[in-house]
């Protein structure tokens, strides 16, 4: 089977990672002690993608948990799923990275990285046919951002032909932990552009908006935000974990979603949105789901898709859904909003379906969009970066860890290039390509 090794780094990465394992274990009928108590054969059919079977009926996640301070690890270990993970797979330092990307990437993180790679190697050796790695981390801190990207480049060196997929929480001024988030995020994106194959952008600001506006929560906690993230992660990985036809592994997903290798940053969405603890009391229909899913308010990245165009889209419907109806609705959306889809990629909207719905709802859909509007998110980070960098604010924190200003300049220009590339493809039309084709025969005649 095509296994995936999961790595969670830093406080944020470990928190959303733990939530992910909670949801996935629940969907596959795996108890907190790792024993299978499920009822449906489909739960076991592709269980080996994320779990290692040890002994009869006992499963252990293929997860590596990393942090530069012991605090988060302790809370995962004492949390509901503490007994599920392999004890050797907790790797932590003592000092913390203090929200400093350079500490995570060059000093503290670099000291710990070899012991992490040993565990990753051990997990990779325990697979039949490894398809790739998924990393959960935030881009605003020190460990998840700095050490997370260091791990990615090291894993890339060792497994150059395996997929690398990241769930990256992008910082936002609305929900800010520290003042240097724009630095950490820009330095991280610089790495993600080169070393990741698919990055699912999750944005705290958008998650907060969903909690306020849609779920009517007056004071959302990180627990509420992580609850939303776990919906999306569960939905994206549905195709990987349950038998299905479309996007059934990371590489196929990338083939369908990434038209140009650098443009692999996806917006994610989920419908129907429900708050923690409140289940839905009305049935949803496919048209409602489709409409909700394309709604800007449902996006987990604070970019408005109406300000850009979709290069590619994938939707994963779950529950007892008629595929015919899904196809009709998706076609309908494209016909009505054709201006928002680039016309030079044919069949760029795909739908998959899985019979097992998420807990508590009859039907749900997860949305993945490669939209040029994601540049808004990068612009926002980049503007904050530039404002600070031109005054060299807080730069000494990074230079005293051995970083060079040149690295900041490079990261800044790489971010600007990325924004420009998205803009270029947003403006591209079929006419431009057609003109080019018409010019060629003219030369032959002369």
Curated annotation (Swiss-Prot):
Q: Which GO terms describe its cellular component?
A: cytoplasm; microtubule
Q: Where in the cell is it found?
A: Cytoplasm, Cytoskeleton
The record ties this protein, via InterPro entries, to: Beta-tubulin_BS (IPR013838), Beta_tubulin (IPR002453), Tub_FtsZ_C (IPR008280), Tubulin (IPR000217), Tubulin/FtsZ-like_C (IPR037103), Tubulin/FtsZ_2-layer-sand-dom (IPR018316), Tubulin/FtsZ_GTPase_sf (IPR036525), Tubulin_C (IPR023123)
Q: Where does GTP bind?
A: 11, 69, 138, 142-144, 204, 226
Name the UniProt key words of this record, in alphabetical order: Cytoplasm, Cytoskeleton, GTP-binding, Magnesium, Metal-binding, Microtubule, Nucleotide-binding
GO terms of biological process kind: microtubule-based process
GO MF terms on file?
GTP binding; GTPase activity; metal ion binding; structural constituent of cytoskeleton
Primary site of residence: cytoplasm
What domain of life does the UniProt record list for this protein's source? Answer: Eukaryota
The cofactor named in the record is:
Mg(2+)
Entry keyword Signal? no
Give yes or no: UniProt keyword Cytoplasm. yes
Which residues take part in binding Mg(2+)? 69
Subunit composition and interactions: Dimer of alpha and beta chains. A typical microtubule is a hollow water-filled tube with an outer diameter of 25 nm and an inner diameter of 15 nM. Alpha-beta heterodimers associate head-to-tail to form protofilaments running lengthwise along the microtubule wall with the beta-tubulin subunit facing the microtubule plus end conferring a structural polarity. Microtubules usually have 13 protofilaments but different protofilament numbers can be found in some organisms and specialized cells.
The Swiss-Prot or TrEMBL record describes its family as follows: Belongs to the tubulin family.
Which PANTHER family does this one have? TUBULIN (PTHR11588)
Q: What's this chain's function? A: Tubulin is the major constituent of microtubules, a cylinder consisting of laterally associated linear protofilaments composed of alpha- and beta-tubulin heterodimers. Microtubules grow by the addition of GTP-tubulin dimers to the microtubule end, where a stabilizing cap forms. Below the cap, tubulin dimers are in GDP-bound state, owing to GTPase activity of alpha-tubulin.
Per its record, how is this protein called by name?
Tubulin beta-1 chain
Q: What is the lineage of its organism?
A: Eukaryota, Fungi, Dikarya, Basidiomycota, Agaricomycotina
Per UniProt, what is the name of the gene that codes for the protein in this document? TUBB1
């Amino acid at each position: 089977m095509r296994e995936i090794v999961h790595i969670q780094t830093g406080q944020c990465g470990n928190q959303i990672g733990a939530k992910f394992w909670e949801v996935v274990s629940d969907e596959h009928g795996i108890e907190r002690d790792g024993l299978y108590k499920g009822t449906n054969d489909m739960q076991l059919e592709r269980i080996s993608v994320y779990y290692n079977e040890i002994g009869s009926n006992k499963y252990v996640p293929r997860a590596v948990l990393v942090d530069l301070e012991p605090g988060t690890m302790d809370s995962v270990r004492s949390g509901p799923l503490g007994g599920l993970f392999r004890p050797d797979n907790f790797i932590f330092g003592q000092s913390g990275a203090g929200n400093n990307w350079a500490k995570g990437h060059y000093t503290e993180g670099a000291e710990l990285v070899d012991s992490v790679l040993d565990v990753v190697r051990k997990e990779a050796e325990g697979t039949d046919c490894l398809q790739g790695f998924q990393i959960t981390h935030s881009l605003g801190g020190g460990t998840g951002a700095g050490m997370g990207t260091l791990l990615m480049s090291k894993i890339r060196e060792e497994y150059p032909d395996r997929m690398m997929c990241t769930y990256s929480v992008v910082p936002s001024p609305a929900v800010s932990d520290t003042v240097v988030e724009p630095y950490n995020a820009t330095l991280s994106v610089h790495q993600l552009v080169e070393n990741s194959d698919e990055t699912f952008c999750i944005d705290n600001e958008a998650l907060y908006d969903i909690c306020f506006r849609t779920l009517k929560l007056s004071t959302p906690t990180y627990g509420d935000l992580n609850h939303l993230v776990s919906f999306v992660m569960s939905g994206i990985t549905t195709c990987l974990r349950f038998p299905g036809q479309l996007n059934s592994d990371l590489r196929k997903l990338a083939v369908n979603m990434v038209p140009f290798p650098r443009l692999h940053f996806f917006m994610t969405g989920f419908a129907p949105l429900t708050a923690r603890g409140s289940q839905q009391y009305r049935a949803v229909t496919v048209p409602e789901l489709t409409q909700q899913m394309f709604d800007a308010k449902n996006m987990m990245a604070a970019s408005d898709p109406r300000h850009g165009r979709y290069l590619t889209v994938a939707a994963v419907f779950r529950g007892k859904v008629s595929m015919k109806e899904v196809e009709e609705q998706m076609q309908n959306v494209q016909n009505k909003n054709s201006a928002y889809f680039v016309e030079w990629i044919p069949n760029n909207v795909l739908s998959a379906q899985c019979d097992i719905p998420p807990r508590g709802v009859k039907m749900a859909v997860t949305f993945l969009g490669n939209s040029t509007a994601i540049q808004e998110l990068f612009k926002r980070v980049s503007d904050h970066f530039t404002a600070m960098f031109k005054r060299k604010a807080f730069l000494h924190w990074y230079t005293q860890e051995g970083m060079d200003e040149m690295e900041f300049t490079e990261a800044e220009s790489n971010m600007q290039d990325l924004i420009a590339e998205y803009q270029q493809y947003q403006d591209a039309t079929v006419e431009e390509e057609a003109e080019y084709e018409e010019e060629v025969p003219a030369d032959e005649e002369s």
